[in-house]
Amino acid sequence: MFRTISNFMRVAEIRRKILFTLAMLIVFRIGTFIPVPHTNAEVLKVQDQANVLGMLNVFGGGALQHFSIFAVGITPYITASIIVQLLQMDVIPKFSEWAKQGEMGRKKSAQFIRYFTIILAFIQAIGMSYGFNNIAGGQLITDQSWTTYLFIATVLTAGTAFLLWLGEQITANGVGNGISMIIFAGLVAAIPNVANQIYLQQFQNAGDQLFMHIIKIVLIGLVILAIVVGVIYIQQAVRKIPIQYAKAVSGNNQYQGAKNTHLPLKVNSAGVIPVIFASAFLMTPRTIAQLFPDSSISKWLVANLDFAHPIGMTLYVGLIVAFTYFYAFIQVNPEQMAENLKKQNGYVPGIRPGKATEQYVTKILYRLTFIGAIFLGAISILPLVFTKIATLPPSAQIGGTSLLIIVGVALETMKTLESQLVKRHYKGFIKKVN
């Protein structure tokens, strides 16, 4: 492992990418401590961490607790991406057309998502300013004029736009997916605070229960280890479909086709994107509900859409399964695969080229995705159930999801770095799972 890390730093291009990514993430972390003018963030630090503020704060790496310029985060971008990709499924012809235009279509979609993100960020910033000021008893905003709210919303929107720019810079010039890396950095930054809360609850004034609390912490460690091992295994597991290439015939001459190979289909083609989207999707109505604390509907949403509540947990798993299938077929296009194989004189033994191959790949992808979706759902709620049984702090409820995202993003980043090493004939350390 250490040799591989050394290999990373020996290659100038990879070293530059790593250092650039670290620099961008440091900028992000600094920004989480810069408070928005005309606000008193101290009042948020004493709020109940069991509410949606606590969950948003974990995902934002503490930005919301400080009500910093990055308090809105990149949730608007995630929401905008979900909406646009849903619209591309033959809902609006223009968006469907973009989906079929290749690189040009992706650029158009990306540009629209940027504009849509800014609009959503501004709306969310207004709502957060007003809502969290009400939660804090009117003490968050020091000047209650409408111009102050407008100014604060503008600053928060600019913060989201800057985060989006940081993510794009990391994607273009750094390592891995920039947006995922920002989420990763925020979650990692929140770990010490969550660990401290667990320590204070379990060991401060433990008295005669100290031994039982130690056993509980050991069990937590075993659950964490199981999640890490499970995520690594399922992220690397693939189903290899054998591919053969026909011999080309020209006159009396016969030419050997390409070497027989295989088509690898991952058990979880969607990665951890479904978990990120499901978390953001489930927190959105709770965030809105917090803006109207006196409403009976809002109280029901806040209580029942909690990750540890049976209704919230069921919706969470359902969203993960739905997004896993949705993104698996975005990442893997059976129709395009079958078409490319046919053009290259390739075929799956026993399966006719063309439509039959497409149907065969689709059937296998459905089965693999089912396994991946159930795994993601189970591994996401396992820590939630354990947290409920072990009576851990509410902030630890989101810890399982955080760990899943952290491990998934870290693994994808290591694969990206390893692919760079392989190009330069260095040996990586991620072993393949057959």
What do the predicted segments below correspond to?
Residues M1-E97, Q101-N434:
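N-terminal cationic and glycine-rich segments that engage phosphates or anionic surfaces
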